[in-house]
Amino acid sequence: MADQRQRSLSTSGESLYHVLGLDKNATSDDIKKSYRKLALKYHPDKNPDNPEAADKFKEINNAHAILTDATKRNIYDKYGSLGLYVAEQFGEENVNTYFVLSSWWAKALFVFCGLLTCCYCCCCLCCCFNCCCGKCKPKAPEGEETEFYVSPEDLEAQLQSDEREATDTPIVIQPASATETTQLTADSHPSYHTDGFN
């Protein structure tokens, strides 16, 4: 059993139908009927001395589980067992994306764009370094202010000078100290609402 060659992944999507003895356009009722008939025939309880029957029963169960699930059956019909493997690895919603990106024309497009942009150096320079470290940066349209960088030290100095100019009169009275009994406003009266949430 260990010397046996591993089964290769098919792309035709027909072998599960052959396991159940059906053709590719079988309905879900046909699949159920064929599964019941073959499951009774190859069930391990009915064939206790036949290990091939147990293996055949496992294949029948696998075929039934895949062909009765509408999403898995659709993937199997389009891409075969390779599609089921991809769905298991990357998720059922990503199967089409995987096969599109692994097609010859997607790979050729990727290589062509790489050659056109000097191994994507142009994209890296434009996106990461703002076109030659800002030297080739696109000009802002007329009438719009250009954004520029202000260092935190310059910003702090500007804020301090604005505060000095805005406060002409110094504050000469210290605020009163607060304690636990100090109220936030002078005209409010304390209420503890102990009489039924008024």
Swiss-Prot record:
It is found in: Cytoplasm, Cytosol; Membrane; Cytoplasmic vesicle, Secretory vesicle, Chromaffin granule membrane; Melanosome. Acts as a general chaperone in regulated exocytosis. Acts as a co-chaperone for the SNARE protein SNAP-25. Involved in the calcium-mediated control of a late stage of exocytosis. May have an important role in presynaptic function. May be involved in calcium-dependent neurotransmitter release at nerve endings. The lineage of its organism: Eukaryota, Metazoa, Chordata, Craniata, Vertebrata. GO terms for biological process: chaperone-mediated protein folding; exocytosis; negative regulation of neuron apoptotic process; neuron apoptotic process; regulated exocytosis; regulation of synaptic vesicle cycle; synaptic vesicle exocytosis. One of its GO terms (molecular function) is ATP-dependent protein binding. The gene is DNAJC5. It is linked to Ceroid lipofuscinosis, neuronal, 4B (Kufs type), autosomal dominant: An adult-onset neuronal ceroid lipofuscinosis. Neuronal ceroid lipofuscinoses are progressive neurodegenerative, lysosomal storage diseases characterized by intracellular accumulation of autofluorescent liposomal material, and clinically by seizures, dementia, visual loss, and/or cerebral atrophy. CLN4B has no visual involvement and is characterized by seizures and other neurologic symptoms. This is DnaJ homolog subfamily C member 5. GO terms for cellular component: azurophil granule membrane; chromaffin granule membrane; clathrin-sculpted gamma-aminobutyric acid transport vesicle membrane; cytosol; intracellular membrane-bounded organelle; lysosomal membrane; melanosome; membrane. Upon phosphorylation, Ser-10 interacts with Lys-58, a highly conserved residue in DnaJ proteins that is also a ubiquitination site in DNAJC5. The keyword Magnesium does not apply. Residues 13-82 form the J domain.
